[in-house]
Every structure is written in C-alpha cells, then in structure tokens.
C-alpha cells in the first residue's frame, strides 16, 4: 500500500474509527455524525441488542470484515496473524464498492472494531484518511466483554492489547487523533470541543 509520504495532499474527509470491541467506538461514531460526518444511509447501519442506540457502522462493511477473517480461519476473538493474497484481494474488492457509496458525502467515516486488524489492507483504497483511535480503560473493556460474551479477563486483556497495537501500527505516519472514551463520558462537552478543534485543524 502507499505510504503517507507518497501523498502530499490535504486531509481528504475520510475518517476511520479504530478501537477494540466495547471501547466506545459507537459513541464516537454518533458524535461524528452530530458534527456533520456521514456514516452512510440509516437503513444500511448495523443495529443490535448490545447497542440499541446504534453502532453507526455499515452492515455490509461489518460482514466484509467478518468474511475476511473467516477466509484465513480467524474471527474477532482469534485474530490469526496469517494472511493470504486471495483473502486480501477479495476484501479490498468488496470494501472498494462499499467505500464508493460514501464518496458523494464527504466528510464520511467508517467504523468496525475488526478494522483494527484490517485497516492496513484498506490503505490503497483511501486518499489521505484521518484515523481516530478510541481508547478505553482495558479493565473496563474486559468487564464489558465478560458481561456480553462471558470472556475471561486474561483473554480480554490480551485481545485489547493486540487490537490496540495493530490499530496504532496501521495508522503510523498518517493523520490520527486519540479519543479517551472515559474522558468523553465524564466531560463530553470539553472532549467534543477538543475533537472538533482538532478535526478542523486537520482540514
């Protein structure tokens, strides 16, 4: 994929939210929508009992990520490091069609926790994206995963670390911001103003 230094361009109005499951990425997606960014048509957005307010996540992108991991025998709880050219190519082809549907409404954003593992494979499809990393206390993430999925704490903490490392490695060198979910919950106005200011500064 291309590298940041290959693109001497202004930020393009493409945003990618990255964060581990149960880290507050849906809250940040809702916030971006309030700030004027587009997640796609409402009828295309994923909804579930675990997040009745909505995930602000394209259902077809979610399924593309699921299929990409399944293609190499992986899933969100068992994200194998192995890849294959065929799996990557199939994922990029599917993702390209999905992203094209957003292009008429910049600024737009995408989110799916599995993108922490797959964002690097999207880079050839993006112009000059901004990555928004959503960070939550890993102990709180583990507690949430235990409640939702019955996941043991040691597994949840190891998974949080893996997703977080992969996400920051994927965005290395690109425009990126970090959003503290706990700070957003405790002081939403200040965090929202800060996010708006930082995004405005990026163009």
What spans do the regions from the language model cover?
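PAPS-dependent sulfotransferase catalytic domain
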Residues: 70, 74, 96-203
